[in-house]
């Protein structure tokens, strides 16, 4: 019997994701928040003449391109990691717990292929969810405040087309720490056989890392904490572009993602699924 390709196995995984409620819950969280944000700012503008008294919202009405940047600032700490983990934490645990992994492994598919397909499906879901959030935020912002020039974090005014490219780049770069969080979720999903434990556990890890940053005396390790990397995309929105935090974040995130995926593979390789 011919062994199916990893891409074929990944298509199986994507079909399963389409039938699961948590798939749509995660995307819904990522998409609804920008709409609520834009609605709130429109109401604020209508009743109070805008948000000039707020450091984050002072320029929001100047250009709709400020909206996806501001929503990324707010969503990056919790909502977007939660979106990624709702699937990553479930991707192995549910089938393992239900005893259906052994059915997949009897289709002449080796374990490495199965895990690679699951990681690929979780990664694709994370990418699609993130850019759906970006698209909704951009469209809603532009519809409310126009496709105008935008002010960078350095105070430099850039044209609307360049501003749009910077927004895309910012979201693209945020994928690096987000995929690292996803990798931790896959690892815990593989270890625990319990979706809730994997999701809560991975969120707990990120929460602990975030809390470490506010503990006095931890400044020397803060540059190496995953949650610190959530904000390093800010360097793309400065003039000139500050590449130092970008490259630093890339290799720091790799230190979290690569060992997590290797450990997940080793655990999955040795997992006894014969009894369910």
Stretch-by-stretch model annotation:
Residues 31-86, 116-182, 186, 233-252:
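Secretory targeting signals
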Residues 113-115, 268:
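Alpha-helix N-cap/helix-start motif at helix boundaries, enriched for small hydrophobics
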Residues 1-31:
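Aromatic- and glycine-rich beta-strand/loop motifs that create alpha-glucan
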Residues 36-46, 164, 192-227:
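Transmembrane helix segments
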């Amino acid at each position: 019997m011919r062994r199916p390709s990893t891409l074929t196995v990944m298509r199986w995984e994507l079909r399963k994701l389409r039938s699961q409620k948590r798939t749509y819950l995660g995307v819904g969280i990522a998409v609804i928040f920008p709409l609520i944000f834009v609605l709130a700012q429109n109401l604020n503008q209508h009743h109070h003449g805008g948000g000039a008294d707020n450091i984050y919202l002072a320029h929001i009405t100047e250009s709709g391109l400020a909206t996806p940047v501001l929503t990324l600032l707010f969503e990056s700490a919790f909502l977007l990691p939660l979106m990624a983990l709702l699937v990553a934490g479930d991707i192995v645990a549910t089938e393992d717990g239900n005893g259906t992994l052994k059915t997949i492994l009897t289709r002449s598919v080796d374990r490495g292929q199965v895990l690679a397909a699951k990681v690929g499906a979780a990664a694709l879901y994370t990418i699609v969810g993130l850019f759906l959030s970006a698209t909704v935020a951009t469209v809603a912002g532009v519809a409310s405040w126009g496709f105008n020039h935008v002010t960078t974090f350095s105070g430099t005014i850039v044209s609307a087309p360049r501003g749009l490219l910077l927004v895309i780049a910012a979201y693209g770069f945020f994928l690096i720490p987000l995929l690292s969080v996803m990798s931790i979720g896959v690892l815990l999903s593989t270890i625990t056989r319990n979706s809730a434990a994997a999701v809560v556990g991975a969120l707990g890890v990120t929460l602990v890392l975030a809390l470490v940053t506010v503990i006095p005396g931890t400044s020397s390790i803060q540059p190496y904490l995953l949650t610190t990397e959530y904000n390093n995309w800010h360097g793309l929105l400065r003039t000139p572009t500050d590449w130092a935090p970008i490259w630093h974040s890339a290799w720091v995130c790799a230190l979290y993602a690569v060992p997590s995926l290797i450990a997940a593979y080793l655990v999955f390789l040795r997992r006894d699924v014969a009894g369910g």
